[in-house]
Every structure is written in C-alpha cells, then in structure tokens.
Design a protein with these regions (language model features):
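Acidic, small-residue rich beta-repeat scaffolds with periodic aromatic anchors
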Residues: 38, 43-46, 80, 135-249
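Amphipathic alpha-helices and adjacent low-complexity segments
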Residues: 114-115
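A short, charged
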Residues: 91-110, 170-185
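Boundary regions of SH3-family modules and the immediately adjacent low-complexity/disordered segments
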Residues: 1-8, 13-15, 19, 26-107, ...
Length: 249
C-alpha cells in the first residue's frame, strides 16, 4: 500500500466508484439485526447499514488511488450549482462557448455545459440519475436548460468531443458539433449489486446514448430504423405518476 498527500484544491479525475458499508468506529458495536417496528400489521426489518462511497481518482501527476467520496467537492461553476435542485453535481463538462458582450461575468466567452447529477446519497448502484445540458441565453444573459434525461441509472465517464452525425444527410449533420455520450443501465439488465468485498459496481447490459448540441438544440444520434432501447429507471414510472397525482390534489 502507498499513500499520497494531496493539497486542498488539487484537481482530480474520477475514474471508478465503489461502495461499502461504513466502518463502525472503534469502541462501538454494530447495531443488532432487530425488527425496527411494525406498520399496518407488517414487521419491518432492520434498516440497511450506512454506506460509504470511494472513488478511484487520478491526480495531475498521473498517480491513482482510492479516496473517500465525502471529502471531495465537484469542481462545478456556482452558476450551475444554483440550478441543481437539491441534487449533487457529479460532473460538469464544457461542450462549447458562446460570446456574450453583455454577460455579467468578466469572461465574455461563456461556457455551455453537460452535467451529470445524482442524489446526495452514498451506496447507490449508479453514478448519476440525470443528465442536463445548460446553454447560455445571450438575450437574457443567463443559463437555461436545453436538455434533460432523468430517472436513469447512469455511469461515468461522460465523453465529450466534436463529431459529425454519421447517419444524417443534411449539411448540418455533416458539420462537426459538440457531441456527448454516456451509458445507462438497460431495462432488461439484472439488478446491480455491489461486490460485497471490494464494493465494485459493475453494471450488466448498458445502453450508449449519444447526443449533439446543434445551436441551442440537443438531438440524439441514432441509426435510422433502429428501435430505441429501453432504459432502467431507479424510480418506477408508475410511482412517479402516483406522486404527481398526489401533488395535484
């Protein structure tokens, strides 16, 4: 084993995540597996153990190692954090920049981002549950949501590049544009279970989603005639509909 000392503010690249039960502090015993209570005549089991996430990271020197997720902060602009809706930004990636002479910030070349977002919770079997693209409105001088893919079980990395649409036939398709790709768990994949020893999270069947940013529009890149594969959802669609109905009341 080898330990590396990092300075506060050092930049790190997230490579892979693992999740394990949080160690019990010295002198304390793990809570016994007893019934937590009875609700509507049904016995409830003990609560699951508290989990702790670890990330395999790489620093600027090329050194790699595991680091506790709770002591890291994602390097995301404050302008995006305010739109996070109480969720944690897992990654923010620049797609392109637009020039706005009247932008409130000092740098008038404003970056546009694709972000991966997830709950503030350890022990999840996915890295993020939402992808959002933020474009800059040069008339209103603010960020706006141009695209959102939510209720997904997504996995890093998010890859960004300039690329053409290999399936398109228009001049717009032939021109390189900011393109991003990420993987989500397939609807017919088995439930992901972290390795009990290493905590490694290895999804089964995944779907590669690829999109292009064309101006302020985000369009999926798909081969013609190919059916869109179904993706797994961390929250069942029926549960979401019921929740929306309750809010309307």
């Amino acid at each position: 084993e080898r330990f590396y000392r990092l300075s506060e503010g050092d930049k790190l690249m997230l490579l892979k995540r693992a999740t394990l039960p949080k160690p019990v502090p010295p002198g304390m015993r793990a809570a016994p597996a007893v019934l937590a209570g009875i609700v509507k005549g049904k016995a409830e089991g003990p609560p699951p153990p508290a989990m702790e996430d670890l990330w395999l990271v790489r620093d600027a020197r090329g050194e790699t190692g595991w680091m506790l997720g709770r002591i890291m902060e994602i390097d995301a602009p404050d302008a995006l954090v305010r739109y996070s809706e109480g969720q944690r930004i897992v990654g923010a990636y620049v797609l392109t920049t637009v020039n706005d002479p009247d932008a409130p910030q000092e740098d008038k070349n404003v970056p546009e981002y694709v972000t991966a977002v997830g709950p503030y919770k350890s022990g999840l079997t996915y890295d993020f549950n939402q992808i959002r693209v933020f474009t800059w409105n040069v008339k209103k001088h603010r960020y706006e949501t141009a695209f959102r893919d939510k209720n997904i079980e997504g996995y890093l990395p998010v890859e960004v590049k300039m690329a053409t649409d290999p399936y398109g036939k228009s001049p717009v398709d032939a021109a390189p544009a900011p393109t991003f790709s990420y993987r989500v768990l397939s609807a017919d994949a088995p439930v992901v279970v972290p390795d009990p020893v290493t905590g490694a999270i290895v999804p089964g069947k995944t779907i590669l989603k690829t999109y292009r940013l064309e101006g302020n529009l985000v369009r999926r890149v798909l081969a013609p005639g190919v059916p869109v594969p179904g993706a797994a959802h961390p929250v069942a669609e029926t549960e979401k509909k019921v929740a929306r109905g309750q809010r309307r009341r």
